[in-house]
């Protein structure tokens, strides 16, 4: 595994994203809707650095088996409508890849009438899009390498690496 983005660089970028969220939602609160399991590390670090009131909710979707996307999105864990309705929701994702999963999740959440709805992803593999989708807060734009660490895994391994690495 080769280091792609170091722990220090990730930390600096998360602080920048938190500052942007603070500015965008000054005087308000936000609900971070964390996608399990991959985005947990990112969501926790981001939440610690946001200074406005933060609430956290969790959802779990699945579209991968091993290193391959199945192309189908399934919701394994969802939240109550009351956790979304009239709230400032920021969906927290580890990586935007094809855009399919987040398109489905965003559509589902929008139907629950949030006050606002945005997406924050640590990583963006923009060249991999198969549907039009743009995140609102992006940590890093990267290529199509298969990556692990900082919450990202391959068959549940390497999630705990403190950096983002490329599997060779």
Give the positions of each predicted feature.
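PRPP-associated nucleotide enzymes
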Residues: 1-168
């Amino acid at each position: 595994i080769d280091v792609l983005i170091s722990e220090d660089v990730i930390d600096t970028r998360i602080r920048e994203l938190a500052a942007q969220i603070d500015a965008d939602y000054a005087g308000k609160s936000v609900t971070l809707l964390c996608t399990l399991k991959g985005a947990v590390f990112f969501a926790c670090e981001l939440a610690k650095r946001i200074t406005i009131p933060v609430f956290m909710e969790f959802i779990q979707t699945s579209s991968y088996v091993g290193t391959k996307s199945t192309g189908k999105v399934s919701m394994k864990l969802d939240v109550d409508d009351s956790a979304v309705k009239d709230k400032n929701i920021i969906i927290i994702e580890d990586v935007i890849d094809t855009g399919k999963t987040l398109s489905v999740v965003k559509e589902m959440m929008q139907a629950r009438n949030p006050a606002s709805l945005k997406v924050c992803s640590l990583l963006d593999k923009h060249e991999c899009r198969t549907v039009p989708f743009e995140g609102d807060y992006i940590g890093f734009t990267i290529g199509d390498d298969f990556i692990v660490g900082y919450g990202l895994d391959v068959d549940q391994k390497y999630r705990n690496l403190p950096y983002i690495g490329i599997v060779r």
